[in-house]
Amino acid sequence: MIANSESFLAVDIGNTHAHFGIINQRKILDQWSVPTSSLGDDLSLWSWQDKLKGKKLSGCCYCSVAPSVNKVFERHLSKIVKKIHHLNCRNIKGIKIQYPKPEEIGQDRLANAVAAKNLYGCPAIVIDMGTAVTFDILSAEGYYEGGIIAPGLSLMTHYLNEKTELLPKIPASEIEVPASVIGKSTVAAMKVGCGLGYAGMIESMLKAVLEELRNSSQEKVSVTLTGGDAGKLLQSNLRVYDYEKSLTLLGLAIEFEHQDLTMVL
């Protein structure tokens, strides 16, 4: 854990939104999101810089899947904090990677794996439900082994609308696991198909991964759900697993502890 009580900044830069969190002792004190495009635009910077005014921050740890904004973001961030750590597969310390092409692993997925290992133990599975659904698997020894990438809920709903003439566009926010599996209208039928199909896809993939892990280890497997759509599945069979909305930010917090020499683990 952290030897001092200074807060620091964690930032998860995604394709559409960047998520900010001010963290102290692995507790998130404040968090907010801004469009990722604003990080690479000098005219839009104040939308996130204003939130940091007056904050005493020991540094920043961030991950990014939008490399085009990183340079401008770091340039302006360096005026606020002096210690900036950009998490990637080459400098990560919170986990060990056993993967043929580690540079292909999304940095947010690495942060999730760090959080899962340290908060829930290994072997571990992290299921992140965003634009895409990703599974990240850690062995009993704590090695990052690989995972699964599948379509997310918003891709399902958009694809039905884009590839047909008569099916309407339904926001992913309106989809949930249905009480009845018989839709009484086109929209209701689509909601059943997407909601039930989404949950079924994830449950099926999870079952297969659990079976493979249990064949290689007798230890209990921790399963953690995160991502914008994870809350929708708390009504399904997945409700028995851990749910952490801010898993990526917490993973960045733990990685910052490993990287910062002024902290004691």
Where is each model-derived feature located?
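Gly/Thr-rich phosphate-binding beta-strand-loop-beta motif of the actin/hexokinase/Hsp70
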Residues: 1-29, 116, 122-144, 160, ...
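Short hydrophobic alpha-helix segments
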Residues: 32-34, 148, 253
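N-terminal glycine/serine-rich phosphate-binding loop of ATP-dependent small-molecule kinases
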Residues: 1-93, 265
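Glycine-rich phosphate-binding/hydrolytic loop that grips phosphoryl groups
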Residues: 165, 235, 241-265
